[in-house]
């Protein structure tokens, strides 16, 4: 409340400083918010593409697996899967996007040669190889989708946080500061007018007293002149 602020020039200067600081902060946060939104839109486009690829790769992998099962049988497919010795390795790093730390997921040993798959040429068939290729491609797409969607969620959270801070400054803090400033300025003007009126009143009183003193002196002078005996 403005009434809680003492109307002093020191407080007025302090509020002016806070207003300038808050306005700079507001502008900076607006720029950050706009930049985050632009980055988010880029990531959103990428996420939509990755999601489309993910759905397509999943359908392809399922079709290849069904074909391998139909042509080679479940036993052969399960045997090829069980022969796998090396599993994919996942490592995560961090990257900074306009102050937002998002994960960067790196994978290795996802796509493999026949030897790396463990079953070799004799224990495989073209259908099983195609199914393995399709699922390795699907795994890489899943990893990319996880990275992109996690980044998107973090960016969206930061955008919402920044928007709340912008709104708090724009619709709460700055209006309160301007209200306090206006209140102090009005009170200081009132005090100044009261002081001017007080000084003017003192001045008028002093002038009136001086006039009274002059009149008294004049009357005394006239009386003295009247009482002085005339020369013979």
Curated annotation (Swiss-Prot):
Residues 200-232 are annotated as: Disordered. GO terms for biological process: proton motive force-driven plasma membrane ATP synthesis. It is found in: Cell membrane. GO terms for molecular function: ATP binding; proton-transporting ATP synthase activity, rotational mechanism; proton-transporting ATPase activity, rotational mechanism. It comes from the Archaea. Residues 209-222 have a biased composition (Acidic residues). One of its GO terms (cellular component) is plasma membrane. Pfam families: ATP-synt_D. It is a peripheral membrane protein. Keywords: ATP synthesis, Cell membrane, Hydrogen ion transport, Ion transport, Membrane, Transport. InterPro entries: V_ATPase_D. Belongs to the V-ATPase D subunit family. Has multiple subunits with at least A(3), B(3), C, D, E, F, H, I and proteolipid K(x). Component of the A-type ATP synthase that produces ATP from ADP in the presence of a proton gradient across the membrane. This is A-type ATP synthase subunit D. It comes from Haloquadratum walsbyi (strain DSM 16790 / HBSQ001). The gene is atpD.
């Amino acid at each position: 409340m403005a009434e809680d602020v003492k109307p002093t020039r020191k407080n007025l200067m302090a509020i002016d400083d806070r207003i300038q600081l808050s306005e700079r902060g507001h502008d900076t946060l607006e720029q950050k918010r706009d930049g985050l939104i632009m980055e988010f839109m880029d990531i959103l486009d990428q996420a939509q593409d990755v999601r489309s690829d993910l759905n397509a790769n999943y359908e392809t992998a399922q079709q290849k697996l069904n074909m391998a099962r139909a042509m080679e049988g479940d036993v052969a497919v399960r045997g090829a899967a069980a022969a796998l010795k090396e599993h994919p390795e996942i490592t995560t790093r961090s990257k900074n996007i306009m102050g937002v730390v998002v994960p960067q997921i790196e994978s290795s040993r996802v796509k493999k040669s026949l030897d790396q798959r463990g079953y070799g040429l004799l224990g495989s068939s073209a259908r099983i190889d195609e199914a393995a290729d399709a699922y390795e491609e699907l795994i890489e797409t899943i990893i990319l989708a996880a990275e992109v969607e996690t980044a998107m969620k973090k960016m969206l959270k930061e955008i919402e946080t920044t928007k709340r801070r912008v709104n708090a400054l724009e619709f709460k803090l700055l209006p309160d500061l301007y209200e306090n400033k206006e209140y102090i300025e009005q009170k200081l003007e009132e005090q100044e007018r009261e002081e001017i009126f007080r000084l003017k009143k003192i001045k008028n009183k002093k002038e009136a007293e001086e006039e009274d003193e002059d009149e008294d002196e004049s009357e005394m002078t006239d009386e003295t002149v009247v009482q002085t005996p005339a020369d013979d």
